[in-house]
Amino acid sequence: MKRLEKISSIVPILLRITLNLALIMVGFTLVAFLIREAFTIFNNIFFLDTDVSYYYMTQDILTFFLYFEFIALIVKYFESHFHFPLRYFIYIGITAIIRFIIVDHSSATSTLILSGAILLLVAALFLANTKMLKREG
């Protein structure tokens, strides 16, 4: 019986270590993509080719912010003692929907529905930031 208790106490620790190592690898990968995206934006600003439109540059900037938000989420996970704050997922959702609207705004109905989704996420963010639901220090 004691052996089973010892195994059941070791398994969560091993899983947490595995999760943390995987998140560290994902974080470094995202940093590499963030640097690549920053380099692309820098090249587009200072060495703007006439074939590159501002539409694609805006898309690159929003992709940069998505990478940035995911990196911030991973950093916050380690700072808040292995807990993902809900509001960071909401920020990522809002940014992703805005990027999608910019990329594909051909249908007015879908743009209106996506705008409503952003409004719902902002309301959820407001609720998540109330003192009753906020668990961060």
Swiss-Prot record:
Q: Which domain of life is it from?
A: Bacteria
Q: Name one GO biological process term.
A: cellular response to phosphate starvation
Q: Name one GO cellular component term.
A: plasma membrane
Indicate whether Transmembrane appears among the record's keywords. Answer: yes
InterPro entries, per this entry?
P_starv_induced_PsiE, P_starv_induced_PsiE-like
Question: What keywords tag this UniProt record?
Answer: Cell membrane, Membrane, Transmembrane, Transmembrane helix
Topological category with respect to the lipid bilayer: Multi-pass membrane protein
Location(s) in or outside the cell: Cell membrane
- Which residues span the membrane? 15-35, 55-75, 82-102, 108-128
Q: Name one Pfam family in it.
A: PsiE
Database matches in PANTHER family: PROTEIN PSIE
The UniProt family comment states: Belongs to the PsiE family.
Protein name per Swiss-Prot or TrEMBL: Protein PsiE homolog
Q: Which organism is it from?
A: Listeria monocytogenes serovar 1/2a (strain ATCC BAA-679 / EGD-e)
Q: Which gene is the coding source of this polypeptide chain?
A: psiE
